[in-house]
């Protein structure tokens, strides 16, 4: 069971974007960082365990020649083995900061040459894999940046092609040196999923066909791909084969966020139907089949939920953002 804990006030509110919450836990400092997008700015907040807000910072898109400031599409902390970077994507480009948002270490402008006059450029979908940061784009390409142990010498390593429509989300999992193991999955507006193996050159392992419904959020855990769709379904696939194992009618409206607690295999799903659900994933050791169990449901009354994340790898707490909601809601297990 979970109960509502002290919420964290926001200066504005959360924009109606999927995956509009990022969480970074700093156990050594007993702090948790939260990141939320609102229009042309991103709010960063630090809070103590009891939810006491300690610091706030606002980040804006790097200014260009446009009349109005470009909108931010996502903010996300990327935890690499040797450093943590905060990545901000927008309609103009990709910005990477030190983890507290104090110093911008890299800027990548989107190339308008790839866009037609009727297409809106944007980057969306952010994840870290080993010493790479991968970012999706409106064209369906995934940009792979090579990140040094320190400093600003970040390099665009390669561009991955596997999607024909805009990227919605990217998820990764540490493969721990296992050869041939799928450790990244990408999703797009048509519902297509691509499963990759990272390395000096990324390799496309499996392509899972869509069914005419967008896939706003995706996660990867121990060879299981969890995908949340615009029709409210959560589908669980085998990452190696692409086979569909389980289909859950989890929500009544489009899913806005999925998250995983990797230590225990808990999956969190949130949707525009005001509900947040927690599921337990498992792979049967004898048959190899994927199993799922519903653990908890929470109704966020009169709220279009747009972001939800576990606040610790054990899945004992989670946070939720909603459109036009001027606070981050927090829940802890009892």
Curated annotation (Swiss-Prot):
Name the UniProt record assigns to this protein: WD repeat domain 54
Primary localization class, coarse: other
Gene Ontology MF terms in the entry: protein homodimerization activity
WD repeats: 162-206, 208-247, 250-289
GO biological process, one term: fusion of sperm to egg plasma membrane involved in single fertilization
Species in which this protein is naturally found: Rattus norvegicus (Rat)
Subcellular localization: Vesicle; Cytoplasm; Cell membrane
PROSITE patterns: WD_REPEATS_2, WD_REPEATS_REGION
Modifications made to the protein after synthesis: Cross-linked to tightly form both dimers and trimers by TGM2. Cross-linking enhances the activation of EGF receptor-mediated signaling pathway. Cross-linking is inhibited by EGF. Ubiquitinated. EGF increases ubiquitination.
Keywords, ordered alphabetically: Cell membrane, Cytoplasm, Fertilization, Membrane, Repeat, Ubl conjugation, WD repeat
Distribution of this protein across tissues and organs: Widely expressed in the ovary and testis (at protein level).
InterPro entries registered for this protein in UniProt: WD40/YVTN_repeat-like_dom_sf, WD40_repeat_dom_sf, WD40_rpt, WDR54_beta_propeller
Subunit structure: Homodimer and homotrimer; forms tight forms of dimers and trimers. Interacts with IZUMO1 and IZUMO1R/JUNO.
Entry domain remark: WD6 repeat is required for cross-linking by TGM2.
One GO cellular component term: vesicle
Functional description taken from the UniProt entry: Plays a role in the adhesion and fusion of the sperm-oocyte membrane through its interactions with IZUMO1 and IZUMO1R/JUNO. When cross-linked to form dimers and trimers, it has a regulatory effect on ERK signaling pathway activity in response to EGF stimulation. Colocalizes with the EGF receptor in WDR54-specific vesicle where it sustains the internalization and controls the degradation of the EGF receptor after EGF stimulation.
